[in-house]
């Protein structure tokens, strides 16, 4: 999928219109619902429901399974980038350096970046202004 064709599914448009996302963004729950409109299982975890070590384990386990993916909702400012909340996939975890590789969906502006696990966790452990929940 791309940001342009994600909403081509009629079921997806019933959940949330792309115009709304362009204007105000998307919450973690909404993302889970949108992904569920495609025949996939999406599990939503908020940082307030887990802890850093559990997050490491969940992501490492998920990355070891073919056909599984991890998307993170994080506050860009907390990892030294511009703007606010953002969602991007994690491509890898390096246990030796304790860093995650984020493949930014805005690759025209942000190249892939290795982020310390603790820094990413702090960026996720911020409140989403729309949902009032942590990311």
In which residue ranges do the predicted regions lie?
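Noncatalytic regulatory segments and standalone regulatory/sensor domains
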Residues: 95-135
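Extracytoplasmic/secreted proteins, especially bacterial periplasmic and envelope-associated proteins
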Residues: 26, 30-33, 54, 58, ...
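Sec-exported extracytoplasmic/periplasmic mature domains
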Residues: 36-43, 64, 95, 125
């Amino acid at each position: 999928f791309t940001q342009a064709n994600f909403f081509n599914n009629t079921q997806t448009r019933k959940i949330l219109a792309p115009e709304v996302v362009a204007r105000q963004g998307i919450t973690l729950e909404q993302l889970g619902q949108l992904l569920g409109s495609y025949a996939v299982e999406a599990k939503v975890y908020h940082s307030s429901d887990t802890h850093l070590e559990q997050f490491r384990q969940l992501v490492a386990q998920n990355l070891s399974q073919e056909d599984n993916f991890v998307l993170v909702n994080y506050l860009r400012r907390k990892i030294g980038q511009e703007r606010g909340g953002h969602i991007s996939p994690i491509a890898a975890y390096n246990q030796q350096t304790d860093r995650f590789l984020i493949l930014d969906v805005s690759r025209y502006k942000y190249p892939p970046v290795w982020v310390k696990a603790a820094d990413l966790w702090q960026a996720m452990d911020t409140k989403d202004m729309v949902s009032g929940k942590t990311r």
